[in-house]
């Protein structure tokens, strides 16, 4: 491949920060919706599954509707991934946030079972289907867009900002539900209070749409289109054939990221209440505080990944959880509240290493002309199989074995596999150009360096197989 210095991408670091905010809004909205739904399952069950007498079964049906969203994510990943690789990243990100906002608003407006009968749960299910479908193209698109718009030397530190949106969305949901339950009676919450957060989600979506409409297309995508007119000539089977190793590493990385993520954010609150016997308010405050502390930790580890390489930060997380997961769950069974807090915050500490590195690292595993669709499909299949099922698997393990430490064994096993795969198969790409692309630089000094060292600028040429 001939080197053309004119194709080196000069990017503005300040604009890159704005792209993080605009794309992070989508993450915030996704997790705000997830958090609100999780916190209001009892009210949703009472409104949409009222003929069911058992509260436990109503809750199961409510969670089943939530699980449907995960099953639709891979389909959304395929559709939006193909569109994103062919027509651009921006068009998808603009579309997904509209669909997400609409589905969230719909849930808040739906009549109850007592008003329209069986249509109520059916419409709830359809709203969750739309949410899952749109989310399937959202996160992979956000990661891709930020990675392609950031200077290579700051890709992880800027990418970690996406997870700030994730954490902020969940924190906002927790705080809003806490305020509503404080100011409203239980009857008012069951009647109309639970709907308020879903209705307010519309404004978050409109704000995100406003920001995203002002975005420009990523420089990497524009450069790729300009230099490779016949770029979209490979199908999924060929992608798997040529890049199965990269797909496998990405799949495993998403597994250990999401199993840890859902273990801490989705399962741990239930574990603390049902097994450890903490009250709901204390549990909510603890989990919210953990996520708040993870925000500066994620930013710190993102900067560290740019300096020492994301592979080493991955290994800090997987290695740490290999050693600490069982200890952490043992600490949760302590009679000391302080010791319990240490166990929870320890899990959050190691999770923050993933929050910091995943957004900036996963897009680097694939070439520009196949990046969106391959990342989107791989990410969403992995999340659907392992991420969304984590609370269910953890609950089943405790019930089946009778061992309250069973979830820790599961987390340890996943972490060991992740540690081995990253150690032996992952190549650190921190500071390097994205595969299939010329370098992204934000100063003339870096540009001059790559002009003098073209082989380092196009380090990926020898690896490309299609």
UniProtKB/Swiss-Prot annotation:
Cellular compartment(s): Cell membrane
GO cellular component terms attached to this protein's record: plasma membrane
Membrane topology value: Multi-pass membrane protein
Gene Ontology molecular function, alphabetical: symporter activity
Transmembrane intervals: 20-42, 63-83, 91-111, 116-136, 164-184, 191-211, 247-267, 285-305, 313-332, 337-356, 379-399, 405-425
Keywords: Cell membrane, Membrane, Symport, Transmembrane, Transmembrane helix, Transport
Chief location of this protein within or outside the cell: membrane
Coiled coil regions in record: none
Protein purpose: May be a proton symporter involved in the uptake of osmolytes such as proline and glycine betaine.
Entry similarity comment: Belongs to the major facilitator superfamily. Metabolite:H+ Symporter (MHS) family (TC 2.A.1.6) family.
PANTHER family, per database record: ALPHA-KETOGLUTARATE PERMEASE
Name the record gives this protein: Putative proline/betaine transporter
Source species of the chain: Staphylococcus aureus (strain MRSA252)
């Amino acid at each position: 491949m001939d080197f053309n210095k004119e194709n080196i991408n000069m990017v503005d670091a300040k604009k890159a920060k704005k792209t993080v905010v605009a794309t992070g809004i989508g993450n915030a909205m996704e997790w705000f919706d997830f958090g609100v739904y999780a916190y209001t399952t009892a009210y949703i069950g009472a409104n949409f599954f009222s003929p069911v007498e058992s509260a436990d079964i109503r809750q199961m049906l409510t969670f089943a509707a939530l699980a449907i969203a995960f099953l639709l994510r891979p389909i959304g990943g395929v559709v939006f991934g193909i569109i994103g690789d062919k027509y651009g990243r921006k068009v998808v990100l603009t579309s997904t946030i509209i669909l997400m906002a609409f589905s969230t608003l719909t849930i808040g407006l739906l009549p109850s079972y007592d008003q329209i009968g069986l249509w109520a749960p059916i419409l709830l299910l359809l709203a969750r289907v739309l949410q899952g479908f749109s989310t399937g193209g959202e996160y992979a698109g956000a990661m891709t867009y930020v990675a392609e718009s950031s200077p290579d030397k700051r890709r992880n530190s800027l990418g970690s900002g996406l997870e700030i949106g994730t954490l902020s969305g969940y924190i906002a949901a927790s705080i809003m539900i806490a305020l509503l339950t404080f100011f409203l009676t239980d009857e008012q919450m069951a009647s109309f209070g639970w709907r308020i957060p879903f209705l307010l989600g519309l404004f978050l979506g409109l704000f995100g749409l406003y920001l995203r409409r002002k975005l420009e297309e990523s420089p990497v995508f524009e450069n790729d289109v300009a230099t490779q007119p016949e770029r979209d000539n490979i199908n999924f089977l060929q992608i798997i054939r040529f890049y199965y190793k990269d797909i496998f590493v990405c799949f495993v990385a998403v597994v250990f990221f999401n199993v840890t993520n859902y273990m801490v954010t989705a399962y741990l609150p239930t574990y603390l209440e049902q097994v450890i016997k903490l009250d709901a308010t204390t549990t909510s405050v603890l989990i919210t505080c953990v996520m708040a502390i993870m925000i500066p930790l994620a930013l710190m580890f993102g900067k560290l990944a740019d300096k020492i390489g994301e592979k080493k930060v991955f290994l800090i997380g997987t290695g740490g959880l290999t050693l600490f997961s069982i200890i952490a769950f043992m600490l949760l069974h302590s009679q000391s509240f302080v010791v319990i807090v240490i166990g929870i915050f320890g899990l959050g500490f190691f999770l923050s290493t993933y929050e910091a590195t995943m957004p900036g690292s996963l897009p680097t595993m694939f070439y520009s002309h196949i990046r969106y669709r391959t990342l989107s499909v791989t990410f969403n299949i992995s999340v659907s199989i392992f991420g969304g099922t984590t609370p269910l698997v953890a609950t089943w393990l405790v019930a089946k074995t009778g061992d309250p430490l069973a979830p820790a064994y599961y987390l340890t096993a996943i972490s060991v596999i992740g540690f081995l795969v990253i150690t032996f198969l992952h190549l650190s790409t921190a500071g390097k150009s994205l595969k299939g692309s010329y370098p992204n630089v934000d100063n003339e000094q870096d540009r001059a360096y790559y002009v003098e060292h073209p082989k380092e600028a196009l380090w990926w040429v020898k690896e490309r197989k299609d």
